[in-house]
Amino acid sequence: MADDAGLETPLCSEQFGSGEARGCRAAADGSLQWEVGGWRWWGLSRAFTVKPEGRDAGEVGASGAPSPPLSGLQAVFLPQGFPDSVSPDYLPYQLWDSVQAFASSLSGSLATQAVLLGIGVGNAKATVSAATATWLVKDSTGMLGRIVFAWWKGSKLDCNAKQWRLFADILNDVAMFLEIMAPVYPICFTMTVSTSNLAKCIVSVAGGATRAALTVHQARRNNMADVSAKDSSQETLVNLAGLLVSLLMLPLVSGCPGFSLGCFFFLTALHIYANYRAVRALVMETLNEGRLRLVLKHYLQRGEVLDPTAANRMEPLWTGFWPAPSLSLGVPLHRLVSSVFELQQLVEGHQESYLLCWDQSQNQVQVVLNQKAGPKTILRAATHGLMLGALQGDGPLPAELEELRNRVRAGPKKESWVVVKETHEVLDMLFPKFLKGLQDAGWKTEKHQLEVDEWRATWLLSPEKKVL
């Protein structure tokens, strides 16, 4: 009886990641008997025994224990600790990303075939020097484009990573279409392939940079290197599959340009659709201007804060990667004031670490940030600017803002700085509630993805100034 009781009483337990825990019981002979029924998915369906040290070497010992579950394809292609080590949107994004990569690989094979044909591969009249010159012009154009685009938009890619990711893949399709059409017009071949390579280099900058931003979002255990490495492994596997299919596809389409073009259009449609689904699956938990607009509008109209899932589902993807002209954060102070009187007007009523100038006629807001302005101050400044824009609209507003909007519309037109001062008082009541609602809904307010320039300023403030 005592032995039976010992066999039934768990001595300890263990689990791998978030998997099912297994218990360990004492067997009658003093060995440890581990349960493995919870690991049936890995092909284990019976208990195994670990013998004490010094027992019969012919019996099953510690070496007979099964290897940890993370020993198959999951270990090769998924980050360690999956799914707990990555964001909840990791799997749907990676699945659709693999589909788009496969379609892009096949389209790329068709484009490469067309470029080689245009350069003169298989043509006895083509010269090596002409082909080399074409290739050098194509590559040098792309290199210059890469540098210029990285300088022009590099600092803006974090703010709208999803939109730029989609833009990069669509531009890649355009580049491959140019390559396919290049041999049709031999006189413009060099210019066409150079333009195509320029577009592809822009794609490499935008796509690579936004992929890095998405890796930061997906990695939940400071495992960005692991997530990036496994993403590369997945992409390599997909490209290998695409290469094998291309070997079968190219002989079928090489003699029929119309069929080749039809295959390209089909693969392009699949590529764009899969990209859209992949980007739409992402749930970013930090606020950029587009998501802040959606969340603030919903809050002002209904008094509720949208959670990240709902806001990301509503976020526009086909637009949004160009900065909206209605809100500019981090502008230089000299752009807004040219006299002591204008500076006094701008500072009056501002007890926060920012100065806000509102152009009512064009509904444009420009914000000067103090040296001490932190993420929450910037978030408040952006909320303030978007709230001023809401005064120009016709939708429902909270009672405090509705009263202010009615006063602005009923009486003579007020100076912008007077309205800004009054909205500061309203925001003092609304913003703490809004900020708490954001945090309760799951938004990460300690950081943001708002587009902010590097200009900072200092000015004389009232003693009641608050620094967030």
From Swiss-Prot:
Bilayer-spanning residue ranges: 247-267
Record-listed Phosphothreonine modification sites: T49
Keywords: Acetylation, Membrane, Phosphoprotein, Transmembrane, Transmembrane helix
Pfam families reported for this sequence: UVB_sens_C, UVB_sens_prot
GO CC annotation, single: membrane
Residue numbers carrying N-acetylalanine: A2
Reported impact of G43E: In a breast cancer sample; somatic mutation
Keyword Nucleotide-binding: no
Membrane topology designation: Single-pass membrane protein
Subcellular location: Membrane
Alphabetical list of InterPro entries matching this protein: RUS_fam, UVB_sens_C, UVB_sens_RUS_dom
Source organism superkingdom: Eukaryota
Similarity comment: family membership: Belongs to the RUS1 family.
Protein name as catalogued: RUS family member 1
Lineage, top ranks: Eukaryota, Metazoa, Chordata, Craniata, Vertebrata
